[in-house]
Amino acid sequence: GSLSFSLATAGCVFRCLNCQNWEISQKKPEETKDPRGPELRLRPPVAGLTAADVARLSMFPEDVVALAQWTKSASISYTYSEPTAYYEYTYDTCKLARERGIKNVLVTCGSMEEPPMRDLGRYLDAAHVDLKGFDEGVYWKLNAGRLQPILKTLKTLKSMGVWFEIINLVVPTYTDKPDMIRRMCDWLAANIGPDQPIHFSRFHPQHKLQTLPPTPVEILLQAQSIARSAGLRYAYIGNVPGLRDAETTFCPNCKRAVVTRDVFAITGFYLNAGRCSFCQTKIAGIWS
C-alpha cells in the first residue's frame, strides 16, 4: 500500500442516522473552530508543525498539497465528511495536486449532479462511493437522500474511466434484506460491470442508531455470496477483523489468493504488473 494524506471540512449533504463522523459531518464549519486560539496561516517550513498546530490551521489548497508532499504521501484523500459540501475547495486542491504529481482519492456519498462530477472527475485517480442501499424509501429514511443520483454518479465515473470501489454498509432492519442486496448486485453487474469491487461493511451502533445491534456476520457472508452469484468478481466484507478471507482478493480465473490483507495491512501480494502471478490473468484495480 501507500500513504494517503486525508482531510475534511465540517458539513455534509446527507443526514445519515448511523453516521460515524457526525461530530464534524453534522455541523457547520464555524461550529468546529479550535477553541485554543485564532486560526493560523500555514507558512513553510512545515517540518516543525505538530498535530495541535495542524488542528488550528486555515489551510488553502497549496497548503494541503505542501503538507502531502512533506509527508511523502502518494495521494490526497477527501474523506470523513462529504467532499460535495466543500466542492470548490476539493476541486482546487485536486487540480493543484495533479499538477504536483500527487493522486486524488474521493470518498463520497455520490450525491452530485453530473456536470460538476465530470469537472472534478478529470482530476480524480480513484473514488470510494457509498451505495447505502437500493430502495428510495430506505435512502430517504436512513440518509435523507435519494438513490437515483448515486446510481448516476456510478455510471458517470465508469464512463470517465475513474477507478472506484463501492461500499455498502449493511444496517440491520434497514439495508440487510437479501432481496434488496440481490437487486443491487444485479443492477451493478448489468450497469457497471463485474470488475468493480463491492465491500459489505459491518454496521456498529453510532449516532442516532445506538439501539441497533452490530450486523450479524452471517448476513455479511450472505451478502458476499449474493454478489458473487450475481457475477461480481471482487466482493469483500469490511469491519470484521479476523474473518478469514473477508478482505482477500482472489484471481477470477485460477481462484488463487493474489492479495491478502489484515485490516489495513497487506500480508501477501502475488501480482506482477497488475496480473496474477500464477496464471497471468489481469486483476482489476490500481496497483502502482
Go through each PLM region and give its residues:
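Auxiliary Fe-S-binding modules of radical SAM enzymes
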Residues: 173-288
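Short glycine-enriched, charge-decorated loop/helix-capping segments at active-site entrances
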Residues: 50-54, 140-146, 212-213
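Conserved glycine-rich "GG(E/T)P / GGGxP" loop and the immediately following alpha-helix
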Residues: 69-92, 138-151, 168-183, 189
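Conserved Radical SAM active-site core
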Residues: 1-126
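Structural preference for beta-strand elements that scaffold enzyme active sites
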Residues: 75-77, 103-105, 126-128, 163-165, ...
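Helix C-cap/helix->beta junction micro-motif
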Residues: 71, 100, 160, 192-194, ...
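Conserved radical SAM core fold
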Residues: 25-28, 83-85, 111-117, 127-144, ...
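Alpha-helical scaffolding segments of alpha/beta enzyme cores, especially the outer helices
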Residues: 63-66, 88-99, 115, 119-122, ...
